[in-house]
Amino acid sequence: MKKLRFFVVSDSVGETAEIAVMAVVSQFRPNFDQVDIRRFPHIQDMGHIENIVTIAKKQKAIIIYTLVKKELRNALDQLGEQNGVQVIDLLGPMMDLVEKKLEQKPLEKPGLVHQLNDFYF
């Protein structure tokens, strides 16, 4: 069995996406050791995204991402499609839905959930 690679891409620390990958992968024991997870935190620009997609293509990795900036989400989706790299957006669809329901644009500031946790807990 060949190794399955996940690239976790985030504009914050990447914990949310990594936990989601682990939740999925845990359902496929005893093959857990056949999975490689690599985290790419604090991604803020197109140059980083282009490099990650290039590496993912070479390594046949699946990209799982949590980016709050719509411009970066769209770019990653487009580059993934152009390069034949599977890309999964964990936050975008929910952010788009909440934006429509609240009729309000999101702040698009990375790391706010960590500030919230510090405030409440």
Question: Model-predicted segments: where are they?
Answer:
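Conserved beta-strand segments of alpha/beta enzyme cores
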Residues: D33-D36, Q86
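Long, charge-dense
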Residues: Q86-F121
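Metallocofactor- and cofactor-centric catalytic cores in central/energy metabolism, strongly enriched
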Residues: D36-L67, R73, Q78-E81
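N-terminal accessory targeting/assembly segments
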Residues: M1-V24
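Short helix-loop-beta junction
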Residues: A23-D33
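Structural signal for conserved beta-strand scaffold positions within catalytic alpha/beta enzyme cores
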Residues: V8, R39, V87-D89
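Structural motif
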Residues: F6, V9-S12, A61-I62, Y65-K70, Q86, G92
